[in-house]
Amino acid sequence: MPEVADTCSLASPASVCRTQHLHLRCSVDFARRTLTGTAALTVQSQEENLRSLTLDTKDLTIEKVVINGQEVKYTLGESQGYKGSPMEISLPIALSKNQEIVIEISFETSPKSSALQWLTPEQTSGKQHPYLFSQCQAIHCRAILPCQDTPSVKLTYTAEVSVPKELVALMSAIRDGEAPDPEDPSRKIYRFNQRVPIPCYLIALVVGALESRQIGPRTLVWSEKEQVEKSANEFSETESMLKIAEDLGGPYVWGQYDLLVLPPSFPYGGMENPCLTFVTPTLLAGDKSLSNVIAHEISHSWTGNLVTNKTWDHFWLNEGHTVYLERHICGRLFGEKFRHFHALGGWGELQNTIKTFGESHPFTKLVVDLKDVDPDVAYSSIPYEKGFALLFYLEQLLGGPEVFLGFLKAYVKKFSYQSVTTDDWKSFLYSHFKDKVDLLNQVDWNTWLYAPGLPPVKPNYDVTLTNACIALSQRWVTAKEEDLSSFSIADLKDLSSHQLNEFLAQVLQKAPLPLGHIKRMQEVYNFNAINNSEIRFRWLRLCIQSKWEEAIPLALKMATEQGRMKFTRPLFKDLAAFDKSHDQAVHTYQEHKASMHPVTAMLVGRDLKVD
């Protein structure tokens, strides 16, 4: 396979050298907001006569680099913004092809590391202890330690992490014991081992006053004690989802599958850190209705973590396949009509995102070109929903779900422990369906993969569960003022929370509505009393877009009480677009910026055109 350049990394590419293993020893300092320690990288040369190599770093202080007991020369290049600074290391001997060397780098992170959020005790549920969590995807691992920060390189890792003894440390690895810190009796060392090779964006660390509850034979749920019961209840379907996922994807190779419920500022719905999925507390709806996010993160154990996009241009390979598996898991649990309902909801989400970007925007392509583009800035639902739509279309073209799931399982088996591009995927698709090449040649590949805007074909969807949502939304959108008295709470009696959410999504596509309609909607349905985060989010967007001033404090509260970017960014954007709340939105952002996650703060600042 020709080497594909990773334009998001400044490190030596995988064709020059490959990191095979990391041994991390570090100490977590809450007072200084730093990680200090050593990263020992076992690197294998991929070429003859290798005399130097380059690693990614970002805002790191390097104390020294040691190889074979000797300090060696290194240079830290100029900072290149979001990409960080290249670190070139001179090797004491020229390496021959396949020769390995251990490079031990002493480093310290910056308090403003883009990979870490440091929470004060006041920002936690327990209010007693500080909290730290990392988020490395896409290219923030370099802000924790020097590495080849590209998904084209996979490594195993071991770690020893020293933390205050009243706290617990967890990583994206198997827990491997704990002991008092011999250098400081007020501290404890936690040990970890990840034996499956992973891209370094899956390295993860959390430190806090964490407790756990067992919810399955291979699953503990971890959180602060205030959330642990609620979380155990919310995610009780985890083991049944894992079993279905194994049936669809093949054996689960990671051993443990734990869940960590983070503080509200966690910027994503979930992060598929191996052995320890991170999830937002906004999933705690009380009725398990948002558990599709767990199905999604479980599915990444195959698509993403075992078979990985080679560069972030091909991110859709991770996310499209994972959404496809997620919806099959939910289909097995709740029926095929439910799978189609979510698939069609996803198509609506895709339409919304394309409308937001503009239909000729390059970020609406399935395969993107991230040369000089920060992956955090390009991030959207496109790789998820356009990717899913392509796979769903292929499923229907090639003979249905069982046939296409056969392909997916074979794809995972073929490319496990590797990193792949769209061309690798497409070649394998053609070889797997060699008897259906005529059908595959009907696909407008160029438009699907490389053109912006909506896909060339819309798949077929069963609309059984969606029809009620559309019908009710149509009633509201077409209602005249004199029709408003015809609405009542009985309208909702046969709708699930998933359908209620879809109803609001449908109305939101037609927003704004007359203010009288919105007030009547609140009067009969009392949406302000609903705490389900997805429903509340769409309801508050509808209120602000329809210019209901009374909703401003509620929308500001939701935008700041939690920091899941899916909710926080659109709420701030809507508030900024409404003249009555524009200044308040900017002021509230500036007030909260210092306590926000670094990536969230950066992106909301861009959205609001401040900073």
UniProtKB/Swiss-Prot annotation:
**Could you say which residues form the signal peptide?**
none
**Keywords linked to the UniProt accession:** Acetylation, Cytoplasm, Hydrolase, Leukotriene biosynthesis, Metal-binding, Metalloprotease, Phosphoprotein, Protease, Zinc
- Membrane spanning stretches: none
Q: Name one GO molecular function term.
A: aminopeptidase activity
What is the top EC class of this enzyme, as a single word?
hydrolase
Quote the record's activity regulation. Inhibited by bestatin. The epoxide hydrolase activity is restrained by suicide inactivation that involves binding of LTA4 to Tyr-379. 4-(4-benzylphenyl)thiazol-2-amine (ARM1) selectively inhibits the epoxide hydrolase activity.
Q: Where in the cell is it found?
A: Cytoplasm
**Listed GO biological process terms:** leukotriene biosynthetic process; peptide catabolic process; proteolysis; response to peptide hormone; response to zinc ion; type I pneumocyte differentiation
Where does this protein hold a peptide?
Q135, C136, Q137, P267, Y268, G269, G270, M271, E272, R564, M565, K566
Impact of changing Y384 to F/H/Q on the protein? Alters leukotriene hydrolase activity, strongly enhancing the formation of a metabolite that is normally produced in trace amounts
Q: Please report a single Pfam family linked to this protein.
A: Peptidase_M1_N
Q: What does this protein do?
A: Bifunctional zinc metalloenzyme that comprises both epoxide hydrolase (EH) and aminopeptidase activities. Acts as an epoxide hydrolase to catalyze the conversion of LTA4 to the pro-inflammatory mediator leukotriene B4 (LTB4). Also has aminopeptidase activity, with high affinity for N-terminal arginines of various synthetic tripeptides.
| Protein name (database record) | Leukotriene A-4 hydrolase
Task: From the UniProt record, report the name of the gene that encodes this protein.
Answer: Lta4h
